[in-house]
């Protein structure tokens, strides 16, 4: 078995993704390799999407997802779109079914190059998100940061899209908040026993909103698909918008929009957006040592 595997540097709305082909191998991308790859500016990433042979009948692959700190992630919508684009280019197919630790994802590439991912049903039960305290209604939980009489952020909506999310509703530009300061405090708040993705959301119309996310295990990120889905669902759930919205991702290079629909007929959340290939190479999944195709560049030694 070769020590190296093929990988592609891709992005979904700027969300930095490494798609790693682990098919035909029993091993996995190690946390140490992930940390080494993220330490190199050329391979710095938000998520690794490792494609493994399918484990379940009717699926095309099992996707193992790692954060930039080496921890496991249950879901990554932007990364899933990148996997679809890579496999569509390889096979000529347009529709795929993936298994992750969070469940089954169905995805399709459209003629215009955008990709839709069925992210499944949202979860609202406090003990399944999970939260450390019982809440009958998780559309507004008791949590704030800042002075008691004048909090900077407060009363988020909490839910899971396969991973825990807290959506804080704000009434001014999401980029005006010091999320680099507040993000780690909220991600690791005792309310979230498995940590959480933290999103600031500003509703701009009944069909549009703007978001910015501190991603669990990755930090400030240009985009987060599952966070966009969670913001859209939470906005509809609290009556701020309808069930179909356009998400403007504030931290990504414009135009940076995702279309999110929380389907009424089956409660599934459908995310549609772009994916972009940047370059390819090979890497050692145990150490993170890598080289770029067509060059002598190498890193993560």
UniProtKB/Swiss-Prot annotation:
It catalyses: (2S,6S)-2,6-diaminopimelate = meso-2,6-diaminopimelate. Its main location: cytoplasm. GO terms for biological process: lysine biosynthetic process via diaminopimelate. It is an enzyme of class 5 (isomerase). SUPFAM superfamilies: Diaminopimelate epimerase-like. The keyword Cytoplasm applies. The record marks 165, 215 as: Could be important to modulate the pK values of the two catalytic cysteine residues. GO terms for molecular function: diaminopimelate epimerase activity. Keywords: Amino-acid biosynthesis, Cytoplasm, Isomerase, Lysine biosynthesis. InterPro entries: DAP_epimerase_AS, DAP_epimerase_DapF. Substrate binds at residues 15, 47, 67, 77-78, 163, 197, 215-216, 225-226. PANTHER family: DIAMINOPIMELATE EPIMERASE (PTHR31689:SF0), DIAMINOPIMELATE EPIMERASE, CHLOROPLASTIC (PTHR31689). Belongs to the diaminopimelate epimerase family. Homodimer. Catalyzes the stereoinversion of LL-2,6-diaminopimelate (L,L-DAP) to meso-diaminopimelate (meso-DAP), a precursor of L-lysine and an essential component of the bacterial peptidoglycan. This is Diaminopimelate epimerase. It comes from Rhizobium leguminosarum bv. trifolii (strain WSM2304). The gene is dapF.
